[in-house]
C-alpha cells in the first residue's frame, strides 16, 4: 500500500477536473482526497497499490474531460493514512 501526494498543473480548476478525478479513483478503488489550491493547481492524496496508482496517474494526465488540460504532474510518496473513500474536499 502506497500513498502519493500529487500536484496537478494546467487548466484544472473550474472545469470539473476534481469530479473527473473522483470518478477515476472510485472506478479504480483508489482512496484519498482531491481539492483546489489557491495557486490554481489541484492537490490529490491517492492511496492504493503501486500498479493501480500508476494507472491512476496515467488516467488523470489525460482526463476524459474536454475542458481540462494537464500540463504537469508532481508526485511524491507520503505516509499512509486511513481513508474511507475518495472525496472532493474544499
From Swiss-Prot:
EC number annotated for this UniProt entry: 3.6.1.7
Disulphide linkage map: none
UniProt entry keywords in alphabetical sequence: Hydrolase
Top EC class, one word: hydrolase
Residues at the catalytic site: 18, 36
GO molecular function, a single term: acylphosphatase activity
Gene3D superfamilies on file: 3.30.70.100
Residues covered by the Acylphosphatase-like domain: 3-90
PROSITE patterns: ACYLPHOSPHATASE_1, ACYLPHOSPHATASE_3
Catalytic activity annotation: an acyl phosphate + H2O = a carboxylate + phosphate + H(+)
Entry's family note: Belongs to the acylphosphatase family.
Name assigned to this protein: Acylphosphatase
Species assigned in the record: Ligilactobacillus salivarius (strain UCC118) (Lactobacillus salivarius)
Upper lineage: Bacteria, Bacillati, Bacillota, Bacilli, Lactobacillales
Amino acid at each position: 500500500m502506497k500513498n502519493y501526494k500529487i500536484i496537478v498543473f494546467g487548466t484544472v480548476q473550474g472545469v470539473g477536473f476534481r469530479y473527473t478525478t473522483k470518478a477515476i479513483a472510485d472506478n479504480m478503488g483508489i482512496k484519498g482526497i482531491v481539492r483546489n489550491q489557491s495557486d490554481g493547481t489541484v492537490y490529490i492524496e491517492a492511496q492504493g497499490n503501486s500498479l493501480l496508482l500508476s494507472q491512476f496517474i496515467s488516467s488523470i494526465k489525460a482526463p476524459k474531460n474536454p475542458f481540462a488540460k494537464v500540463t504537469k504532474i508532481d508526485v511524491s510518496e507520503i505516509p499512509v493514512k486511513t481513508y474511507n473513500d475518495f472525496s472532493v474536499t474544499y
